[in-house]
Every structure is written in C-alpha cells, then in structure tokens.
C-alpha cells in the first residue's frame, strides 16, 4: 500500500490573508477560488486582489480569550438557532455542538454540523458559567475566574443558550 506523506510546508497557511484551515470558521458559506488555490490567482493575474471583506472575516471571528478576570469563547454560529446548539461542560472541557437538518437556501439544500471542544482553565468558577447567542449570530460563552482553584467533583452538565435581541457588543481583537 502506498502512503502519501506531505511536507509540512503544504499544510501551512500561505500568509495572513489565507486561512490555514478552510472549514474551521465558515459553516457552509461557500468557497471562493482563492480558498482552494490561493497562490494560483496571483500567478495567473498579477492584478488580481483578494476581497477585503473576506480578509476581515478571517481575522478572528472565532476566538478564545482568557484574562485575569474571565474566560471567554466567541464563536460565529449565525446559521444556527439556539434550539440547534448544545453547550455542555464535561469535567474541564466545554463542548459546543451545532446541527441543523437539511434545508433550502439560495443554492439548493444544505445541512450543517460542527463540534468544538475547549479546555477550561482550572481557576474558572464552573457554577457561574453563562452562554448567550446575539441577534447577529455570535455565541458568547463566559466564565468568571476565581482566586483559588475549586474542585467539587467534576461532572457533565448542560449550559442553556439564551437569545439576545441585540447584536454582539464584544469587539474582536
């Protein structure tokens, strides 16, 4: 059996304007030519410029922030309703799952599903975790940090997702 081994250079992003993994952030929004062959467009046409809008979208829509006072996860899930999202805390991990069945959009029928898993810092107060979905589809998972690490026998528990009527007010960094 032949096994193809790729050099690590082929697995890296080609610069800050190209995402390193295509499907991490955009759940079924469609691909552009430069998403598949980013180096080809500049080779064929030296005057071709990448869309600035797409570059802005690639600049941190999904992110994890951990500072002195809180742990925060921001995730763009605009194609999912709160009923289609599940957020669980299992031991020291946050698991976010989104799934919707096949439905019609502008280009035909589409179904989407994703799983994300994040490790919680040991000093996050797991009894005060919250999760909300803004009107513009930004999921915000937040947990305050405490001074001493609390270990009260970790177990699995679900975190409800609440709907907000206003757009997300958390600026991306």
From Swiss-Prot:
Positions carrying N6-acetyllysine: 99
Basic and acidic residues bias spans: 151-167
Record bears the keyword Magnesium: no
Entries under SUPFAM superfamilies matching the protein: HSP20-like chaperones (SSF49764)
Residue positions, PTM Deamidated asparagine: 101, 123
Subcellular locations according to the entry: Cytoplasm; Nucleus
Record-listed Phosphoserine modification sites: 45, 122
Assembly description: Heteromer composed of three CRYAA and one CRYAB subunits. Inter-subunit bridging via zinc ions enhances stability, which is crucial as there is no protein turn over in the lens. Can also form homodimers and homotetramers (dimers of dimers) which serve as the building blocks of homooligomers. Within homooligomers, the zinc-binding motif is created from residues of 3 different molecules. His-100 and Glu-102 from one molecule are ligands of the zinc ion, and His-107 and His-154 residues from additional molecules complete the site with tetrahedral coordination geometry.
Glycosylated residues (UniProt): 162
UniProt GO molecular function: metal ion binding; structural constituent of eye lens; unfolded protein binding
GO biological process assignments: lens development in camera-type eye; negative regulation of apoptotic process; protein refolding; response to heat
Native source organism of the sequence: Orycteropus afer
Family: Belongs to the small heat shock protein (HSP20) family.
Domain (sHSP): residue spans on this chain: 52-162
Gene (UniProt): CRYAA
Region of interest called Required for complex formation with BFSP1 and BFSP2, as start-end residue ranges on this chain: 1-63
Binding site residues for Zn(2+) 3: 154
Binding site for Zn(2+) 1: 100, 102
Residue numbers binding Zn(2+) 2: 107
Keyword Metal-binding: yes
Segments for region (Disordered): 146-173
Protein name per Swiss-Prot or TrEMBL: Alpha-crystallin A chain
């Amino acid at each position: 059996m032949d096994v193809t081994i790729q050099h690590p250079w082929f697995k890296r992003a080609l610069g800050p304007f190209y995402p390193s993994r295509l499907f991490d952030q955009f759940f079924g929004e469609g691909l552009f030519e430069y998403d598949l062959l980013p180096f080809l467009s500049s080779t064929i046409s030296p005057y071709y410029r990448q869309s600035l809008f797409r570059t802005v979208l690639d600049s941190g829509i999904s992110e994890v922030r951990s500072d002195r006072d809180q742990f925060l996860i921001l995730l763009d899930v605009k194609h999912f309703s709160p009923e289609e999202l599940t957020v669980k805390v299992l031991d020291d991990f946050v698991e976010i799952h989104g799934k919707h069945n096949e439905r019609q959009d502008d280009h035909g029928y589409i179904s989407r599903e994703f799983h994300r898993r994040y490790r919680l810092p040991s000093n996050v107060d797991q009894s005060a975790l919250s999760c909300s979905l803004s009107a513009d589809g930004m999921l915000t998972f937040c947990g305050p940090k405490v001074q001493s690490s609390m270990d009260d026998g970790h177990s699995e528990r679900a975190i409800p997702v609440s709907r907000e009527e206003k757009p997300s007010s958390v600026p991306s960094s």
